[in-house]
């Protein structure tokens, strides 16, 4: 299940981040790619293990932690890896699947957080493959798209301008995407019921089911 998560970052936070990135040191994106992904990865990434990178990563993590939709839909145990990527003209990231394990943790959910507006560049769509179709995403600044890390995906070539994104990986409390979707649907339903009717018997039963499924499936 794919989730568009709007307004992860405020306009003020976006401006601060993009200004910082303008002056920051970027390195070859191949340095963080798996052995076969290096063959199709052509972008630049913010140098890791610098005070600038650590401060920006913490800012994004805090924004995700306070985002209700991200927390409910993804059930993050930890956001274990964050990268800031830049694509200029001619850059792209070909078809690949993300590594299953990163920094000793499982990658259940991948996300791309768009840092500049679609009008700032041409091309650069994130394309995620399904069983018999593809979905393309080029979203407003501050919006994230989250999707199962099991998915084949690519970034189309940027033909004009600069594409800025933060990409990250999550180990979820619930590793299976279908199970996460079931819990999410029940959680949304109980919250909607509570907003309409308050604390009813039906709300209590749905809340019990959400809690018990979390007990059953969390790891």
Swiss-Prot record:
Record text on cofactor binding: Binds 1 Fe(2+) ion per subunit.
Which InterPro entries has this protein been placed in?
Oxoglu/Fe-dep_dioxygenase_dom, PKHD_hydroxylase, Pro_4_hyd_alph, Pro_4_hyd_alph_FE2OG_OXY
E.C. numbers: 1.14.11.-
Give the EC class as a word. oxidoreductase
Would the keyword Nucleotidyltransferase turn up in this protein's UniProt record?
no
- Where do the annotations place Fe cation binding? 96, 98, 153
The superkingdom listed in its UniProt entry is Bacteria
PROSITE patterns attached here? Answer: FE2OG_OXY (PS51471)
Q: Which GO terms describe its biological process?
A: DNA damage response; intracellular iron ion homeostasis
The protein's required cofactors: Fe(2+); L-ascorbate
MF terms (GO), sorted A to Z: 2-oxoglutarate-dependent dioxygenase activity; iron ion binding; L-ascorbic acid binding
- Which amino acids does the record list as binding 2-oxoglutarate? 163
State the UniProt keywords alphabetically. Answer: Dioxygenase, Iron, Metal-binding, Oxidoreductase, Vitamin C
Q: Which SMART domains match?
A: P4Hc (SM00702)
Please list the residue ranges annotated as the Fe2OG dioxygenase domain.
78-172
Could you tell me what this protein is called? PKHD-type hydroxylase SYNPCC7002_A2658
Q: Which organism is it from?
A: Picosynechococcus sp. (strain ATCC 27264 / PCC 7002 / PR-6)
């Amino acid at each position: 299940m794919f989730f568009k998560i709007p307004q992860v970052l405020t306009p003020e936070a976006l401006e601060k981040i993009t200004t910082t990135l303008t002056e920051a040191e970027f390195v070859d994106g191949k340095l963080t790619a798996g052995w076969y992904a290096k063959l199709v990865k052509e972008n630049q990434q913010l140098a890791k293990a610098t005070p600038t990178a650590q401060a920006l990563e913490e800012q994004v993590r805090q924004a995700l932690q306070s985002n209700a939709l991200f927390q409910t839909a993804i059930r993050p145990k930890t956001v274990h890896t964050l990268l800031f990527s830049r694509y200029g003209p001619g850059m792209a990231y070909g078809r690949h699947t993300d590594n299953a394990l990163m920094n000793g943790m499982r990658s259940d959910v991948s996300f791309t957080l768009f840092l500049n507006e679609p009008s700032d560049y041409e091309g650069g769509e994130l394309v995620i493959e399904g069983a018999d179709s593809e979905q393309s995403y080029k979203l407003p600044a501050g919006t994230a798209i989250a999707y199962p890390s099991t998915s084949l995906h690519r970034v189309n070539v940027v033909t004009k301008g600069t594409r800025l994104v933060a990409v990250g990986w999550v180990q979820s409390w619930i590793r299976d995407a279908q199970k996460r979707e079931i819990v999410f649907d029940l959680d949304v339903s109980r919250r909607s019921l509570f907003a309409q009717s308050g604390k009813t018997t039906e709300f209590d039963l749905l809340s019990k089911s959400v809690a018990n499924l979390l007990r059953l499936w969390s790891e």
